[in-house]
Amino acid sequence: MSNLSAEGFQRCFVLHRRPYSESSLILDVFSEEYGRITLMAKGARSKRSNLKGALQPFTPLLLKWSGKGSMKTLRQAEPISLGLPLFGINLYSAMYVNELVGRVLMAEVPMPALFHDYLHALTELAQCENPEPALRRFELALLSSMGYGVDFLHCAGTGEPVDPEMTYRYREQKGFIASVRRDNLTFLGNELIAISERRFVTKEQLKAAKRFTRIALKPYLGGKPLKSRELFIQTPRARSNGK
């Protein structure tokens, strides 16, 4: 059993929360120094609890906990600020980011750099009109943090720099090789350069980045669909039906 007690307050975000017993919560938390952890917040749902409104996703928190085993006990919690203003498609996008972190990261593995990427992604989602670039940058940061090393700038077959106008086919764990075919696994050189720089000038480059991250993340997510994606897909139908 792990003894991962926080000696002082730790910067955290709640990824997901669910009720436990009559008055408590189980929290899936992403912490700056300890990675993803699970906390029991005893009495957090009771009417007298001052934590009831604070332990929400997208609210920057300072948390202190103790205990052994896979589930720790929350001892103290203080909000750093109000929750980030996320609405509409940007809210669903932030929910997707939370679900990715909860599904992909192993428990209790420190990821301080990714925590900052996560914070930057949420901040960007709270301010932007189009969430797609922020999502692609975070997905690429997540893959990089897990050691998913892909060279976007060189042909895996020859070692030569990619040509912006040429087509390259992705081969898992190998990289990109020159190809004359065009399908779901092929990308233009300028798209690979854009993905490497995480800077998307055209819609085509942004679509290519989305296609690549879906391919790369699929083994980590398994066959279980993402709930946030399903909710987002259902939303336009609900609106058209007047719900």
From Swiss-Prot:
The UniProt entry, under Pfam families, shows:
RecO_C, RecO_N
Give UniProt keywords alphabetically. Answer: DNA damage, DNA recombination, DNA repair
Q: Name one GO cellular component term.
A: bacterial nucleoid
GO BP annotations, alphabetical order: DNA recombination; double-strand break repair
Q: Kindly indicate whether the keyword Protease belongs to this entry.
A: no
Question: Which SUPFAM superfamilies is this protein grouped with?
Answer: ArfGap/RecO-like zinc finger, Nucleic acid-binding proteins
Top-level taxon of the source organism: Bacteria
Q: Where is the signal peptide?
A: none
Protein's job: Involved in DNA repair and RecF pathway recombination.
Report the sequence similarity comment from the record: Belongs to the RecO family.
- This one is known as DNA repair protein RecO
Write down the species: Vibrio parahaemolyticus serotype O3:K6 (strain RIMD 2210633)
